């Protein structure tokens, strides 16, 4: 029974994406004057693997584009073509077009014909120039396709040494045996086919290169499942006799001549990752999300049982209570293990910036050195995909407005090469991402003047950090002219809003003439939260534990009134704004006298304030439920959760609460 090869499309798409990313990184690292042989080989192998897979799935345009690039790379690694910056740029452009072609195939669309013809002509022209010819290589697409098909056949032909190739595939899944037989049949005529429950062996009648076979099969199985042996041609009777007595054997017991060519073909790329690749599998994100949801329900159930067990007599039910404690520990360990599946390294984000910085710095006429720190730091997949756009905007802003032109840096006594640092590290239950440049820094006077002209409430006594945060106001920009890079005043406010929607906040530190650091703090995950539950009248609210500094009983002498009905609480010489939770959410029956309640000191976006509640309940894990998708967006509330007794509690948006409280008071005063 035959299986549709389209079942393996996604495997090819995923691996091709990884190969293209590797190709770009190696191209960026190449020194044209003295290219590293290993890097050139890695780029060549990536192109060769993509070409083989594209041919298998019938992605002709991608196959032909990759084939032309592969030929040029082969000339470069054999020293027949001298690399330079223009050639590297052309290879990078080819990689971009290959990515566009791959994306088109993902969407079941045909790639753009114009870009295909353009890049093929450019590559063929380069090939002619490398051979000392200057005739333009303008070739019609149809003719190009035919030519490449002929070249592909020619390059796979081995010397006619009257030998055939026998392939042995082992450790196969049941549904792979027929599929692989079909695919091998597409490459050559098969004879002496022997199929087992988990193995397949066959002789290929035709001139097919071993590395081309490996390139195709490795999109379905691993390289160490493939082995080859040469079968010397003989009269029919002898050949038949040989086939009959040759048992199907796994690669481990094949004679030395049957040594797996797959290992030779992939040696440079696979050696460092052999252990990782042999112990990893691809799992759809939807399945991981479903598993996380089930673990979330388990946490809720465990919380319900824990609440019930607290009502039991510890003398009569000691063993049950002990077992409940063990269940709680196991549930937490399970939750942490499952959550780690969704964690991805920041390298996924950082890897796209070397190319961006290189291209944009060249466009702006600046020299910039990019340093990446903490690429292995992990973050939840849902957040890592959403952080790309904000970080991209910050990097572009640093390049355009932060780092000066070379002549200005020389005048300021700086190195002409500017420094841009992207870093990531864990801080408690958060991840801290920083974008740092050693450019001109923020101009305090210009920012204040611009803010005043826009009618913003500012004064000369504001700290440098407070002045810096003004650039995140909607429509705010001090750029003297608008460019296609930045300066339109739309972006920094969107960056801040996007970060806040992810449950994080953004801070800025800048010193004029020395540079700027923009810091982003995000929770590691949005699925499960460590929180402190508090009560206001009959309502329960959850405060994110990483925002809680301390709690205390306020005294009358520490409370001080301000204009507009506001009050501040003095805590060890520091005056903190007092936010009364019952007023913000209009909760009836709450304790209105501050001295009768409890104050929780919270910190968000570098600012501290005091939150008045009736009672502290305790600390525990809660499963975050999206409130907006199930109800509607509520100001001051970030999400909801289900408590152990089955009731719903709201999770407070700590960063928005103080501003919401101020807006309500201003509205009351204006009325």
Curated annotation (Swiss-Prot):
InterPro entries: Bact_Chemotaxis_CheA (IPR051315), CheA-like_dim (IPR004105), CheA-like_homodim_sf (IPR037006), CheW-like_dom_sf (IPR036061), CheW-lke_dom (IPR002545), CheY-binding (IPR015162), CheY-binding_CheA (IPR035891), HATPase_C_sf (IPR036890). Residues 528-663 form the CheW-like domain. PROSITE patterns: CHEW, HIS_KIN, HPT. Its main location: cytoplasm. The modification Phosphohistidine is found at residue 48. Keywords: ATP-binding, Chemotaxis, Cytoplasm, Kinase, Nucleotide-binding, Phosphoprotein, Transferase, Two-component regulatory system. SUPFAM superfamilies: ATPase domain of HSP90 chaperone/DNA topoisomerase II/histidine kinase, CheW-like, CheY-binding domain of CheA, Histidine-containing phosphotransfer domain, HPT domain, Homodimeric domain of signal transducing histidine kinase. It catalyses: ATP + protein L-histidine = ADP + protein N-phospho-L-histidine. Involved in the transmission of sensory signals from the chemoreceptors to the flagellar motors. CheA is autophosphorylated; it can transfer its phosphate group to either CheB or CheY. NCBIfam families: PRK10547.1. PANTHER family: CHEMOTAXIS PROTEIN CHEA, SENSOR HISTIDINE KINASE CHEA. This is Chemotaxis protein CheA. It comes from Salmonella typhimurium (strain LT2 / SGSC1412 / ATCC 700720). The gene is cheA.
């Amino acid at each position: 029974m035959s299986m549709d090869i389209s079942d393996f499309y996604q495997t090819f798409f995923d691996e091709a994406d990884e190969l293209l990313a590797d190709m770009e990184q190696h191209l960026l690292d190449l020194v044209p004057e003295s290219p590293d042989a290993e890097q050139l080989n890695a780029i060549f192998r990536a192109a060769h693997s993509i070409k083989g897979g594209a041919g298998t799935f019938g992605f002709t345009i991608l196959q032909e584009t990759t084939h032309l690039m592969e030929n040029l790379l082969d000339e470069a690694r054999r020293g027949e073509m001298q690399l330079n910056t223009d050639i590297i740029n052309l290879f990078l452009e080819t990689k971009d077009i290959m990515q566009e072609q791959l994306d088109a195939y993902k969407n079941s669309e045909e790639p753009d014909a114009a870009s295909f013809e353009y890049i093929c002509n450019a590559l063929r022209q380069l090939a002619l120039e490398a051979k000392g010819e200057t005739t333009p290589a303008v070739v019609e697409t149809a003719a190009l396709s035919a030519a490449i098909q002929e070249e592909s056949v020619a390059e796979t032909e081995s010397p006619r040494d009257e030998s055939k190739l026998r392939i042995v595939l082992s450790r196969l899944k049941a549904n792979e045996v027929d599929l692989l037989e079909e695919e091998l049949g597409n490459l050559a005529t098969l004879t002496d086919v022997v199929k087992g429950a988990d193995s397949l062996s066959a002789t290929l009648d035709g001139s097919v290169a071993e590395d081309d076979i490996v390139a195709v099969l490795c999109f379905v199985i691993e390289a160490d499942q493939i082995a080859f042996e040469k079968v010397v041609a003989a009269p029919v009777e002898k050949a038949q006799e040989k086939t009959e007595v040759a048992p199907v054997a796994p690669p481990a017991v094949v004679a030395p001549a049957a040594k797996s060519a797959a290992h030779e073909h992939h040696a440079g790329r696979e050696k460092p990752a052999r252990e990782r690749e042999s112990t990893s599998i691809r799992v759809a994100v939807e399945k991981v999300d479903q598993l996380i949801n089930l673990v979330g329900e388990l946490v809720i159930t465990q919380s319900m049982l824990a609440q019930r067990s607290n009502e039991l007599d510890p003398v009569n039910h000691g063993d049950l209570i002990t077992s409940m404690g063990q269940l709680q520990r196991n549930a937490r360990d399970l939750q942490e293990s499952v959550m780690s599946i969704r964690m991805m390294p920041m390298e996924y984000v950082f890897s796209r910036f070397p190319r961006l910085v290189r291209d944009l710095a060249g466009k702006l006429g600046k020299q910039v050195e990019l340093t990446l720190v903490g690429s292995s730091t992990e973050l939840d997949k849902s957040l890592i995909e959403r952080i790309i756009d904000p970080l991209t905007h910050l990097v572009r802003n640093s390049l355009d407005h932060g780092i000066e032109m070379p002549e200005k840096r020389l005048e300021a006594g700086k190195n002409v090469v500017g420094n841009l640092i992207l870093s990531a590290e864990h801080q408690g239950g958060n991840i801290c991402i920083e974008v740092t440049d050693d450019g001109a820094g923020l101009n305090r006077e210009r920012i204040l003047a611009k803010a005043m002209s826009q009618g913003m409430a500012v004064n000369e006594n504001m700290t440098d950090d407070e002045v810096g945060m003004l650039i995140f106001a909607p429509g705010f920009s001090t750029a003297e002219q608008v460019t296609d890079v930045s300066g339109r005043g739309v972006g920094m406010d969107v960056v801040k809003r996007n970060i806040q929607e992810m449950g994080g906040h953004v801070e800025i530190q800048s010193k004029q003439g020395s540079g700027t650091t923009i810091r982003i703090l995000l929770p590691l995950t949005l699925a499960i939260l460590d929180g402190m539950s508090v009560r206001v009248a009959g309502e329960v609210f959850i405060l994110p534990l990483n925002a809680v500094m301390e709690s205390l009983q306020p005294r009358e002498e520490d409370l001080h009134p301000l204009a507009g009905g506001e009050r501040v609480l003095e805590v060890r010489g520091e005056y903190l704004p007092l936010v009364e939770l019952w007023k913000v959410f209009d909760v009836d029956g709450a304790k209105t006298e501050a001295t009768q309640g409890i104050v929780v000191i919270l910190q968000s976006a570098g600012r501290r304030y005091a939150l008045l509640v009736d009672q502290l309940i305790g600390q525990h894990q809660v499963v975050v439920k999206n409130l907006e998708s199930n109800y509607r967006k509520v100001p001051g509330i970030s999400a909801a959760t289900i408590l152990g007794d089955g009731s719903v509690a709201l999770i407070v948006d700590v960063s928005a609460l103080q501003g919401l409280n101020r807006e309500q008071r201003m509205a009351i005063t204006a009325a």
